[in-house]
Amino acid sequence: MSERAKLQKKKKVTEDLLDSLLLLPPWRNFAISQSHQSIIESSSQRLPEKMRIDENEGVSASSKHLVFAYYVTGHGFGHATRVVEVVRHLIAAGHDVHVVTGAPDFVFTSEIQSPRLKIRKVLLDCGAVQADALTVDRLASLEKYVETAVVPRAEILETEVEWLHSIKADFVVSDVVPVACRAAADAGIRSVCVTNFSWDFIYAEYVMAAGYHHRSIVWQIAEDYSHCEFLIRLPGYCPMPAFRDVIDVPLVVRRLHKSRKEVRKELGIAEDVNVVILNFGGQPSGWNLKETSLPTGWLCLVCGASETLELPPNFIKLAKDAYTPDIIAASDCMLGKIGYGTVSEALSYKVPFVFVRRDYFNEEPFLRNMLEFYQCGVEMIRRDLLMGQWTPYLERAVSLKPCYEGGINGGEIAAHILQETAIGRHCASDKLSGARRLRDAIILGYQLQRVPGRDIAIPEWYSRAENELGQSAGSSPTVQANENNSLVESCIDDFDILQGDVQGLSDTCTFLKSLAMLDAIHDSEKSTEKKTVRERKAAGGLFNWEEEIFVARAPGRLDVMGGIADYSGSLVLQMPIREACHVAVQRNLPGKHRLWKHAQARQQAKGQVPTPVLQIVSYGSEISNRAPTFDMDLSDFMDGDEPISYEKARKFFAQDPAQKWAAYVAGTILVLMIELGVRFEDSISLLVSSAVPEGKGVSSSAAVEVASMSAIAAAHGLSIDPRDLAILCQKVENHIVGAPCGVMDQMTSSCGEANKLLAMICQPAEVVGLVEIPNHVRFWGIDSGIRHSVGGADYRSVRVGAYMGRKMIKSMASSILSPSASSANGGNPEELEDEGIDLLEAEASLDYLCNLSPHRYEARYADKLPDIMLGQTFIEEYADHDDPVTVIDQKRSYSVKAPARHPIYENFRVKTFKALLTSATSDEQLTALGGLLYQCHYSYSACGLGSDGTNRLVQLVQGMQHNKSNSEDGTLYGAKITGGGSGGTVCVVGRNSLRSSQQILEIQQRYKAATGYLPLIFEGSSPGAGKFGYLRIRRRISL
């Protein structure tokens, strides 16, 4: 073979290997970085004009000079610092790089001194707007993005296309500016993104809080990303479905300039002194640093401190130009907020990272999981950060043994891939525009867009956490009798059940089994296992196993009929579902309570004798991005001799959004104190384990509240009627959590019975009976995968609109009754008498919209209510809408007619539905029941509480119902969105038959094909908390 032929063959093999990068599976636990490295190393002897990477020399120069345009997001320094590493290698290879950024020049020029680096100070996105170092303002972030990138979009695209042509750019790189990808496509230049997250995923959460009218922002961002050729994905990544192809690389980390010894010598710090670096991204921290914050003998190096900030003697202010990677590597641990830069450097230099959560940033759970997997992370509660209670966290951090051994040359490898692509590799074959390529995607509860046919790449740890909570879509709806019996026997072996009965409930037996395993976890802290879920470790030390434990259970609910009409006084029909929340409670004398180390430090700092402390562990934190534990001194609930107000409690729990969930649990204690005069003298340990998935519209919050209050009441000998307990739990959600829900959720969870519908008139909470579900009728819930929240903007605005409508109706009725108004309008007393003065008087004092009949509404008020009204206009005319749990935003326009009309008609539909359930069995009966569900669904949509996912599910049910091949044996008859709407679960009614279940599974698969999400199916029922009672148990000590 000739020399030329040999070279050509080697070239072809190398090209095939490089091309295979695009086909590699999602990178897990960094193992794949070795595969990438071997491919790259195999190219080191390729043709001279091609690039190669040498272990010592980095990216070698190509004979083809290239011009790169590198766009950097405006969010923080972390993106800019990792871009430096990639740019440094590109410039070393002889290319020009134009960096488009809003970051200060020194971030780049301190590392790269080359005329080939060009910096253009332009900001084309805004990232997340932060109120301070730890708090993201979600609405402000969306508004700022609109102002920065949406309003001037046409001008931006025109300017960027012109600029790209002017610099003769060969290739565009984005980290991770959306519009840059579209600008590159318009300029006819190929582009690639380099990132660990994308802004469509981050903003999808903000849309939920700000309202779905902002949804177009997410769609546009995804469409922009879809124009790039592929994604170079960094470790700790989020799902990013808008990208066509993915190449995974190792960590991109800034190189070290000096050794630990050199840095400490320059700073005058001895080798044996423990050092923590305080690193919050250069943002002002806003708290007072105290000498007592550190353990004795420690020093703290402060990054980004203002010139005027006075520091205690054991704190050292670092120079503005201090090179942070060297300082981190020379420290014993780091204290800061999680971001890609801090996490990657902590892992690379094996420096334990004490982190404080940021609010509302979806990137964080993925980075946090990676940090904790490699034994490199300790979470600090925000309260302890601000109060200076750092010692237990720092001491815990230096006991860790970080074990990350993966690659840290991601910048080098990314530069290699970019150069290879720019000189002609991986040419794009798909010339369709991004908008035509993308399809709907539902990912981790958010509505996004995806490239069809590509794996969405949900991280394995997330799926595992879902399965552990019993929330897997593939989980079996029933437990076989023999399996159930073995579970019962097993839990009886583990515990003496001193009071109560498990009632054959398999989930209760499973919970008791998990309780029995906790003391094993506690005793095996020296376990050789690489990673134990943090919440399990915390739960392992929660209970004293020699003392009694009280267990309560409360199910979620399926909203069959009624929904949001509950706060307007409607009749509702609710079914308790199979999935439930379990809560275990134990009382302890304060002196004998096992306290977590930071709780001990807090009490010692106060210099007080042991006082009652509440400690809570909640399972499922990994999939809901919240802290797994919460603790407080119960004295914090007291103001002198009286309990604090609900308003103060709401502010107390809102201080740290990562721990706001505790309001649902701990709030039950304060309600008992305020409403029943209970005082708590003992410490309380409480474990929450809920299989009712959050954000699905099946009342996960009510199940937690009811189970928590039931268990606490049982442990303290309080006997509370189930109805009264439900009303108390509603106060938790309304007044302490601050969510404007009605009472039907808590009432169903507390008073419901298995396989029956709870019928209740919400005025405010009159249970009118239990309705037997006929044997031939069955209800299912199908989860749309879209997170739902009654605290969201859409639910709240619809409630405000309904109360506005009620106030207007009352005002109109009063006006008609007024003699002066009647004569002014040309009316006469006889006409008034014909209409019915009693009727008008009742409407003038209308307590609930549902007490107004549909025909009366249409005859007198429908054409007089406005479709929309500005909040300020309403307040000027009517003063207030008389709703104790919502506030009118004067600058916002509210829909009025649809939200007011909905409960009036819904109440009529529910009454009809209830009557139909007791009518003769027939297809007409089922058809009528289904028709009422459809009516309800479209009424929700008219109010603005629909969603693409729930609409799609209802359409799939309709298609199944009207499919000719199914018409002879019709099984599904109707479907509707449930609860607060805007996502969540769809309720389906059908014939109780095997064919119906098969059709439900078929809908599940069709939905997955359309959205990439396999929905949960809720079927079956279980008893409410009142019917279950409680268990009083004691651990059996094995001999």
Swiss-Prot record:
* Molecular function GO terms recorded: ATP binding; L-arabinokinase activity
Q: Where does the record say this protein resides?
A: Membrane
EC number(s): the record gives 2.7.1.46
* UniProt catalytic activity: L-arabinose + ATP = beta-L-arabinose 1-phosphate + ADP + H(+)
Where does the record place the catalytic residues?
745 (proton acceptor)
- The superkingdom of the source organism is Eukaryota
Q: Which Pfam families match?
A: GalKase_gal_bdg, GHMP_kinases_N
State the membrane topology. Answer: Single-pass membrane protein
Any one GO BP annotation for this protein = arabinose metabolic process
Query: Hey, where's the site called Transition state stabilizer on this chain?
Result: 557
Positions binding ATP in this chain are 693-703
Q: What GO cellular component entries does it have?
A: cytosol; membrane; plasmodesma
> What are the annotated disulfide bridges?
none
- TM stretches of this protein: 662-678
Q: Which UniProt keywords apply?
A: ATP-binding, Carbohydrate metabolism, Kinase, Membrane, Nucleotide-binding, Transferase, Transmembrane, Transmembrane helix
Task: Cite any additional comment in the entry.
Answer: Sup1, a suppressor of the ara1-1 arabinose-sensitive phenotype, contains a second point mutation resulting in a premature stop codon and a complete loss of kinase activity. Therefore, the putative arabinose transport function is independent from the kinase activity.
The task this protein performs is described as: Arabinose kinase. Involved in the salvage pathway which converts free L-arabinose to UDP-L-arabinose. May play a role in arabinose transport.
What family classification does the UniProt entry report for this protein?
Belongs to the GHMP kinase family.
Descriptive protein name: L-arabinokinase
- Record the organism: Arabidopsis thaliana (Mouse-ear cress)
The coding gene here is ARA1
